[in-house]
């Protein structure tokens, strides 16, 4: 799905955008933003972010630098260390969960 969407955006960038001229008020352009959003967040969230961006790009809207938001980092908590409960936020890693090391520091 992402591949098809990216193909349509590239088609717009190559065939249609040069005929219309530069119109985007933001950096990166809306089409480049859409490509980055699809690459970073996938089809559903990428389309949502791109649609919101295109709706903001009008003469009475904002302008300037507006990057794609980074992908959220999930956090896990560690509990029961030295008979006290401590919560330590660390980036979630799948290999820790596979090795069953998620409940203690090491």
UniProtKB/Swiss-Prot annotation:
Alphabetic keyword roster: Cell inner membrane, Cell membrane, Membrane
InterPro entries: Membr_insert_effic_factor_YidD
Membrane topology, as annotated: Peripheral membrane protein
A GO term from the CC aspect: plasma membrane
Natural source organism: Acinetobacter baumannii (strain ATCC 17978 / DSM 105126 / CIP 53.77 / LMG 1025 / NCDC KC755 / 5377)
UniProt entry tagged with the keyword Cell membrane: yes
Keyword ATP-binding: no
Source organism superkingdom: Bacteria
PANTHER family: MEMBRANE PROTEIN INSERTION EFFICIENCY FACTOR-RELATED
Major localization class: membrane
Protein name per UniProt: Putative membrane protein insertion efficiency factor
Similarity comment: Belongs to the UPF0161 family.
Any one Pfam family match given in the protein's UniProt record, by short name: YidD
